[in-house]
């Protein structure tokens, strides 16, 4: 589910860019322990009262955003940890650990999601048609991929979200190089890949990527190349894709198995009495302790800049930029 504070009550912390200013791994992990506490509390409370499925009660969180903020035209840059790959990596690992709980627990607390994989940094208007090409290999491996690699290998993130744009001619959600060669074969990722919302439609919609002729072909290509789950409607055409010989049921079963494994790992298929996380009270949501932590990190995130006579700019001396 998307972050709970969009349409429901929850403790609200500073935007990601603000928390990045703190550069405190332990504090960020502690913050996301409280976020996962509130997520678990909402999930079990909804199930007990017959409200589950109405929205904002799920256990998968599309967070953290570990893209690198390079283009100021990207209107969602404040969701990132900034332009520095190392800072982004350390903060991203802390988020995942706080969200997913102890590695040796019987059940995962929640599932975090590393997004948007990969090389996704705006501008926003072009993301459904843009092709990332001619990217220097050093920039790819030293700037854009380190955070994703660390979240997979160090934090064992349980979901990865593929991005909207193309990478070297292929939509990211259909990129064999990104999803199979790098993510699974090189980094050893074993878990679920989910598309960004509507990304599979971009494969064939007019005026977007137009790399595939129709929904069935697009869906088959996405699954074959590693996108297990779609946020959208096009995977409804997978039965047609099987009938046309574009994909086998066996390959679809591989993705289905990953999805079911994720749900079993969260304890969704078991009675709440068997899942220790179910004992987190709904009273923890937006509680005083969490509010005090939000105030603390807000204070620590403030950055003061000393103006040494630079501002306001003198029109006569500023020259051209």
Where are these regions (language model features)?
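Glycoside hydrolase catalytic-domain context in secreted enzymes
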Residues: 1-3, 7-321
């Amino acid at each position: 589910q998307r972050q709970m504070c969009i349409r429901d009550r929850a403790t609200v912390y500073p935007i990601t860019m603000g928390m990045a200013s703190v550069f405190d791994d332990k504090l960020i992990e502690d913050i996301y322990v409280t976020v996962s506490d509130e997520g678990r509390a909402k999930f079990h409370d909804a199930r007990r009262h017959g409200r589950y499925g109405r929205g904002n009660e799920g256990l998968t969180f599309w967070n953290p955003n570990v893209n690198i903020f390079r283009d100021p035209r990207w209107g969602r840059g404040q969701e990132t940890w900034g332009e520095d790959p190392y800072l982004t990596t350390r903060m991203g690992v802390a988020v995942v650990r706080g969200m997913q709980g102890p590695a040796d627990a019987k059940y995962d607390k929640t599932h975090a999601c590393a997004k948007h994989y990969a090389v996704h940094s705006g501008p926003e208007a072009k993301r459904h048609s843009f092709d990332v090409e001619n990217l220097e290999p050093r920039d790819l491996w030293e700037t854009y991929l380190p955070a994703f690699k660390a979240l997979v290998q160090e934090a064992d993130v349980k979901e990865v979200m593929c991005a909207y744009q193309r990478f070297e001619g292929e939509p990211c959600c259909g990129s064999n190089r990104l999803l199979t060669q790098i993510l699974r074969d090189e980094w050893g990722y074993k878990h679920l890949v989910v598309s960004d919302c509507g990304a599979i439609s971009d494969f064939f919609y007019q005026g977007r990527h137009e790399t595939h002729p129709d929904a069935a072909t697009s869906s088959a290509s996405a699954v074959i190349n590693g996108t297990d789950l779609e946020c959208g409607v096009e995977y409804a055409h997978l039965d047609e894709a099987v009938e046309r010989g574009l994909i086998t049921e066996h390959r679809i079963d591989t993705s289905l198995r990953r999805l079911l494994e994720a749900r079993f790992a969260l304890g969704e298929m078991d009675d709440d009495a068997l899942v220790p996380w179910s004992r987190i009270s709904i009273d923890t949501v937006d509680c005083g302790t969490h509010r005090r932590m939000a105030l603390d990190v807000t204070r620590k995130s403030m950055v003061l800049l000393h103006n040494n006579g630079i501002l306001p700019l003198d029109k006569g001396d500023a020259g051209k930029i």
